[in-house]
Amino acid sequence: MTKPHSLIVLTALVTLAGLACAQQTTVTATVAVMNGKKTKARDASNVVIWLTPTDGTVISPLPAAQSFLRPRLVQKDKSFEPHVLVVPVGSLVQFPNRDPFFHNVFSLFEGKRFDLGLYEAGSTRDVLFDKPGISYIFCNIHAEMSAVVIALNTPYYGISDRRGQVLIPGVTPGRYAMRVWYEGALPDTLSMMTKEITVSGGSSTFGLLRIPAANPPQEHKNLYGRDYTPPSPANPTYVHP
């Protein structure tokens, strides 16, 4: 039989949880990737926006291990899917090989540095993204393969769709630093887009964010800092480093 004081404590906890949920809001934004002063790109996907409290409050993201689906970057048809993956810090990301040949996934520049070595079709490798950062992912065999993994120490983030729509659900009202990342933009441009915003109850919107696209990307090097062995693909390019 449940004791009366236990019921009181349980009721209080449920009430507090309900109030917390009621105070959360969905933040929305629309992004436009600008190829020129007046020309918009047709595809505005893969723009990442995230929020961090300005008062230094640490918000623990949900560990990937507590999710039913582990994050993964699949290798298929000599490409990574998805091209941009955002994960909480502490996530163990899977890199399954779905192609009928070997891959050698690596990242040496920013963010997490690793070399998974050669592994065959049907096998997988894991990487722990244990600190915040942006990791540029390549294959040492196939120059045309590239992807980005962004590890964040906040649960408040969203990724734009092709129309440029961004949704960040479950945000607690308060003051935040809003940061933006886009693969085709220069770092200085993205840095200037960082700003403080206030999230209130109900719903909040940032309106339209215009992101100037940079110059065409340059070729990247292989795992050993050398050019890829010919024949090279038609467009073995990447924005960073």
Predicted regions mapped to residue ranges:
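Bacterial N-terminal signal peptides that target proteins for export
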Residues: 1-9
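Intrinsically disordered, low-complexity regions enriched in polar/acidic and amide residues
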Residues: 4, 22-23
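Hydrophobic helical h-region of N-terminal Sec-dependent signal peptides
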Residues: 9-15
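N-terminal signal peptide c-region/cleavage motif recognized by signal peptidases
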Residues: 17-19
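Extracytoplasmic copper-binding redox domains, predominantly the cupredoxin/blue-copper superfamily
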Residues: 23-241
